[in-house]
């Protein structure tokens, strides 16, 4: 009943790095799937509203696909450790 240390270290590092990178990935996806923002400026009695477009917007057709990236990322974070853990379990 010998437990290999390399796969366990790999799992721990994989999960920690994966969790650490989820925030930035989600932030970038939100940035490229947002077409722009509305800005309202109030000066005295005059209110001006304008739309500021996002130059990094990927378009409405691609935004649907790009919005799925965090979901697939989470699936990889779940499936890879599960497969490695299953292989470790079957070796014993």
From Swiss-Prot:
Keywords: Capsid protein, Membrane, Transmembrane, Transmembrane helix, Virion. It comes from the Viruses. It is a multi-pass membrane protein. The chain crosses the membrane at residues 8-28, 65-85. GO terms for cellular component: membrane; viral capsid; virion membrane. The keyword Thylakoid does not apply. Signal peptide: none annotated. Belongs to the fuselloviridae capsid protein VP1/VP3 family. This is Structural protein VP3.
């Amino acid at each position: 009943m010998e437990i290999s240390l390399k796969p366990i270290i790999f799992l721990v590092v994989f999960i920690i790095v994966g969790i650490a990178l989820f925030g930035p990935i989600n932030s970038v996806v939100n940035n490229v799937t947002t077409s722009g923002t509305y800005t309202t400026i109030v000066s005295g009695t005059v209110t001006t509203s304008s739309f500021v477009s996002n130059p990094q917007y990927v378009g409405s057709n691609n935004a649907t696909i790009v919005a799925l990236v965090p979901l697939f990322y989470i699936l990889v974070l779940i499936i890879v450790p599960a497969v490695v853990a299953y292989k470790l379990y079957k070796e014993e």
